[in-house]
Design a protein with these regions (language model features):
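Flexible helical/loop "lid" subdomain adjacent to adenine-nucleotide binding pockets
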Residues: 261, 270, 274, 280-317, ...
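ATP-dependent adenylation/nucleotidyltransferase module used to activate substrates
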Residues: 1-290, 294, 322, 418-461
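Cys/His-clustered metal-coordination modules, chiefly Zn-binding fingers
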Residues: 359-431, 444
């Protein structure tokens, strides 16, 4: 109520509430003692030691849970120089060290594929990049192989053949292999795992490093052929698909040549989520389980594994920064390309932008879709469907393609022609039913008995 002569004072000016800041008393969520240096997710602040233990455990758990790599096996590490593959190489290097609690028991090797010719790099830039690559690979102490993408023009047609694959070992077989390996090491007087000794395998240097840029050499001709192949393709989407296919064929060939039965790739969870959405857009949904799962067994005797599939790009970047993991920057085929230049770039921008707003986007997309693809994976293994997809994008003309691709295409064309020619002479189930309908019932039963007897004795009728 208003009162006469009352003095109304102006409202007291108050300072705005302070902006909340991270408390200096905040501790690591793991040990509750150390000061946090990394925040992976909201509320998940780790100190340096706990973050390293968390990161290493993810890598070890992925290998131990699947148990596809047996002790003493030769494993080829596909290293591109990027953050994820460099982190994978560093994990293997530390896992084989003497001070590791549970040392890895396989024998590693490293392969680097020089894609400079396909990405439009100059000769000087390629030589400089190879020098940095050689310096890092020599520090690892592993046998290493440097090959150029141009070498796909010298691959044999057998690289596309799916070699016979031994049945996957059970858990009991894995335990027996571990016990046998440890017993063998005890007999030899070596405690721990086998690490590649110096001189065990000679370093394989491809022509890309020995005679790179020699005019008139076969490498110069192959480089020109590779450039002509990629220049004949008009869309960036087709170029990226072709590059991925040729790279995989080259790595599988090197693995077979040098006796590697497993190939490790450094694809992270973020990268696989982007690849998953990209393959759906490209109409390759039937092969998602092979393209994004832990293992890819479509090549038969060489199995591709992805031990970094539980690590996000954010975790990889933090780990490499905190622990000084070396890497080599090499421009990709889509470097500086606009967002809508290809389906790959569009899906990458979409997933990363969504991940910024909703931090659980990558894990949700990846894990939910993979759960629905598990039955599809089992069905493709039973019927061999995963081996049908060889090439996703072809150039307007087949002339620039590598010889082994042309040979395989010609062979498949001949198979289709032969199958069409003999189609009318093949006996189908419907023909047998019609034949049985025209003969006497007793004669039909005797024919079935003779046919069953022939199948039981291994004689085909």
């Amino acid at each position: 109520m208003c009162q006469a002569g009352e003095d109304y004072a102006e409202p007291v000016q108050r300072d705005p509430p302070p902006v909340p800041r991270p408390s200096r008393e905040q501790k690591c969520v793991k040990c509750a003692e150390g000061l946090p240096v990394v925040v992976i997710r909201a509320g998940d602040a780790f100190c340096r030691d706990c973050f390293k233990a968390f990161y290493v455990h993810k890598f070890r758990a992925m290998l131990g849970k699947n148990r596809l790599i047996f002790p003493g096996e030769k494993v080829l590490l596909a290293w591109s120089g990027g953050p994820s593959s460099s982190s994978m190489l560093w994990q293997v290097l530390e896992g084989l060290s003497q001070d590791s609690a549970k040392r890895l028991r396989f024998v590693p090797g490293v392969i680097y594929v020089d894609e400079g010719a396909a990405c439009g790099q100059s000769l000087e830039d390629r030589v400089k990049t190879l020098a940095e690559v050689k310096l890092i690979l020599q520090k690892t102490g592993f046998p290493w192989h440097v090959v150029a993408l141009e070498e796909v023009f010298g691959l044999p047609p057998s690289v596309l053949c799916c070699a016979s694959q031994e049945p996957a070992g059970t858990e009991e077989a894995y335990k027996v292999a571990v016990d046998s390996f440890l017993q063998q090491q005890h007999v030899l007087g070596v405690e721990g795992c086998v690490s590649p000794a110096e001189g065990e395998e000679q370093i394989h240097l491809s022509h890309s490093q020995e005679s790179l840029g020699t005019t008139g050499s076969p490498v110069a001709a192959q480089t020109e052929a590779l450039s002509r192949l990629f220049n004949s393709i008009k869309t960036l989407t087709a170029k990226e698909e072709l590059l991925q296919t040729l790279r995989t064929h080259l790595i599988v060939h090197v693995a077979r040549t040098h006796g590697y039965c497993k190939v490790m790739t450094g694809e992270s969870c973020t990268r696989l989520a982007i690849k998953l959405m990209t393959n759906l857009a490209l109409g390759r949904g039937a092969f998602l389980a092979w393209d994004t799962g832990f293992s890819d067994e479509r090549h038969g005797d060489v199995v591709l594994v992805r031990p970094m599939r539980d690590h996000t790009l954010k975790e990889v970047a933090f780990y490499n920064h905190l622990f000084g993991v070396p890497s080599v920057f090499t421009p990709a085929i889509d470097t500086k390309a606009p967002e809508k230049a290809s389906i790959h770039r569009l899906m990458e921008a979409f997933i990363l932008r969504l991940q910024t707003l909703f931090p659980s986007t990558v894990s949700t997309v990846y894990r939910c879709v993979l759960l629905s693809l598990l039955p599809m994976l089992e069905g493709s293994r039973a019927h061999g469907w995963g081996r049908l997809a060889t090439f996703a994008c072809l150039p307007p003309s087949v002339d620039p393609l590598p010889p082994y691709v042309l040979a395989e295409a010609q062979l498949r064309s001949q198979r289709a022609w032969v199958s069409q020619e003999i189609q009318e002479y093949l006996i189908t189930d419907s023909d047998e039913e019609e034949e049985e309908g025209r003969v006497e019932p007793g004669h039909a039963q005797s024919c079935k008995a003779v046919k069953q007897e022939g199948e039981d004795t291994g004689i085909g009728l």
